[in-house]
Amino acid sequence: MLAGPGGAPFCGAYTNSVKGDIQAVGEPLGIDFEENNRAGVITLNRPSRLNALSREMFDALSEHYQRWAPSPHIYGVVMQSSHPSVFSSGGDLKTLHAWSEQGALGAIREFYRAAYSHVWLLEKFIRPNVPLINGLVLGGGIGITLYGTHCVAGEGYRLAMPQVGIGFFPDIGGTYFLSRLEAHTGLYLALTGRAIGPADAYRLHLISHYVPAAHFHVIKDALSDNHPIDRLLDGLHRDPGEGELARLTPAINRIFGMSSVEEILDRLDAESGEDEAWAKGTAAEIRTKSPTSLKVAFAQLRRGKTLSLADALRLEYRLASHLIARADYGEGVSSRIAGKGREPRWHPAILAEVDEAKIESLFMPPVDGELELDERRGETSISPRQLTET
């Protein structure tokens, strides 16, 4: 089974409530933090923005995980969403768009630095860490859920990495986990941005358990009461059935194993038989994406196969630092904010015009320095013995 860092799949009454943090004057942070007996409870609570993640939200998440790691009161952490159908829509594009319009590239870089640093902190956090996802989870939302000890999906779960559609690339650890998915499925998801449900996510080991959302409260109660979480989750887990990608796996493996994006598109265009309609639709979808981002994602996942998570995050910070200064990033974010009917105008507009040397330069260290990650153990983790003795 494909596992994330640390071997996990990709994915006395002590009460204290910490709410009302302020992100800006008059604007709530968008996350509620609560300590309910032995559980740290995180609720994404920014429904008007579909739980889009801001720099302040990443900082607050990191602060609380660092606070809870050594706490003798906390057995584990559970994360949930207040929105009925969205867990998180990813990064806060409205704020990123405003910064891009202002030329505030330093602020954008710090946003991505905070996001990638939080992913690394989660990799080092060994207490039970259980996101409960029963809705759409995109981009940055995947980054705050995939690297825990467990990842629980309900029937409403949908996951997608749509970043190439905004002139960016599949980040937040995508270099690491997408490159390790079976049968070139990671590249397929990266280039198309298509969403998958719980059945495909379970087969690809992007979630650890499929549990009907009606039982999520049982999981929260168990963490609060210090009950062993693995046995409980295994008992609640249900067979999610066969996913949409299962039948397509041979075609994905055959087509997306080609040596360039252009060759992939040629194979999709030439496909016939039972997969012809899927292939034509997939090719059309890919051609709506930023040509530069398509090339970046292809090269990124090729490199990611041999990288550790830490090195993958460092590579992503390099890419982010360079891409935010390019026209496609501002154009892509702007078109997404504008909504349907506003098609992005990519520069260059077609794959044939993308300069391969410029793609290679995007992987070079940024002028503001590399992403610094502490790879020592112990700062945000405790031993299994401590977990059983507290």
Which ranges hold each PLM region?
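Glycine-rich beta-to-alpha active-site loop
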Residues: 122-166, 189, 193-194, 198
